[in-house]
Amino acid sequence: MPRNRTLWLVSIMALVTTAFASGPALAQDPEELEIGFVPSIEAGALAEDIQPLADYLSDALGMPVRGKVTSSYPALVTALQIGQTHIGALPPLGMVQAVDVAGAEVILQSVRFGSPTYHTQFFTNAPDRYCASAPVVNERREAGEMLPFLNCNGTDRPFDGVPVGPIGLEALQKIERGTTVAFTRAGSSSGYIFPATVLANQGIDPVTDLNVIFAGEHDYSVIAVCTGEAEVGVSYDDARPDTVTDCDVAETVVVFAYGPEIPNDGIAVSGDLSDGLRDRIKQALLDYAATPEGAAVLDTIYNINAFADPDLGSLQIIRDAVEQLGYGQ
């Protein structure tokens, strides 16, 4: 059954804000650094994937850099605020919290397929309901291999194409009251905040009209739809090639809509670091992304193709979406 709205919002805001207590300021730059990540897929794999980046930064900066996988984005923002973590890879909402609450500085934003933005994808195991015509095969590259997946309602594209949302949102009106929908986390931009506002704009209350599952990671949302636990799911575009399961994702999970464009994730550093160290961290990351080895590691970690200077003005759309959902009211 849908949860009570007040309890829903209180629990979300408790997760997002309660840990942001003030910590002691650092008098000088630390002797070693910690770079933090939060898994969008299986956490154990991420811990292994980030080690080459940490090793590179250690050499480039001339000081030990350790990688850490944290349990949630609020926890990572808190770690940045109190100086426990010094560099954080954050999603859009995490960057807003890092700037507005933790006093951190965003130094870079990710670029994928030449684009500084991305979007939510809506997918289903019931294409007869949500697809206006038969799904078509799209190929996606994963670990150098081309894999076929199904899309409909104009969401299909070449494997290296860069679609711009929104596309196919009229199909969301076919979601009936009581339908089970798999989101990822309550604080995820593409996994909850933006799809929830899109649904609300289509006349569907994501709290009272739906049976909601919070799957946790984006690949788990795909699995929930593939196994029939949910009829509709959401994730970043495209989480299907990153999903490891015995279920036949390629034949079962059909993408039928894209949400509006969202600014990409980025890198934030603790506000306690000196300007000189911040600049060195930024340059080291730019240099790493420009090497074949670094490009491969960043692609494995978060499908990052490059870094660019941050557009902090683009984050206002995140603040607006959070306000529309009533977080903190």
Predicted regions: what is each one?
Residues V10-A21:
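Bacterial N-terminal signal peptides
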Residues A21-A27:
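Sec/Tat signal peptide C-region and signal peptidase I cleavage site
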Residues P30-I50:
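Extracytoplasmic "Venus flytrap"
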Residues E34-S40, R112-Q121, D246-L285, T300-I317:
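Periplasmic-binding protein-like
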Residues S58-V69, Q84, M146-D160, R177-T180, ...:
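A local structural motif
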Residues G67-T78, P91, D205-I223, E261-P263:
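Short helix-initiation/N-cap motifs at beta->coil->alpha
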Residues S110-G191, Q202:
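A conserved helix-loop-strand patch within extracytoplasmic ligand-binding domains
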